[in-house]
Amino acid sequence: VERRWTAVEGSSMYLRVGESYTLRELLEGLLLASGNDAALAIAGSLGGSEFIERMNRKAEELGLTASHFENPHGLDAEGHRASAHDLALIMAAALQNSVLAEILSMRSSCIHGVTYVNHNKLLWNCPGVNGGKTGYTKAAGRCLVTSCERGGVQLICVTLSDPNDWKDHAALYDWAFETYAEFSLPE
């Protein structure tokens, strides 16, 4: 871990300069603890200055049309933006990756003797929630992307700048699963 990766504002997994972490450990610190330092360490290790270009290329491949990335952690920056629709597409893609799906569903993880608890409290409070990512910046406010599966149906919910995100996600899932009806179209 390089010192420059640890000098970032906001949430952190408190990486130790000079210590080694696996990519899996950094992903857990990023996704459970919202570790901005982990995001910088991943970007620095996997591509340096080219990492953001790779992120934006991947965004195009995923069909994201209203998002552009300027940094790996999502903190406010000129030109950095993401729409609710695009965040849902990112979550859907992440859930297709077994490692990311597993990490997103973890309630906690112990890395180098430090326990990280997932910021997504819906994992404890909302039946069927099996993943998600919290976010907050002064410009964006509270943002939340979650996934929930009940009865073999998987849904993704995204709220942006929502001070009641936990209640809103739980209520939206309850409403959607209560009103969802499966039917066959006539041929």
For every predicted segment, state its role.
Residues 1-85, 94-95:
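Active-site-adjacent loops and short helices of periplasmic peptidoglycan-processing enzymes
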Residues 64-65, 76-187:
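Domain-terminus/edge residues, biased toward the C-terminal soluble/receptor-binding domains
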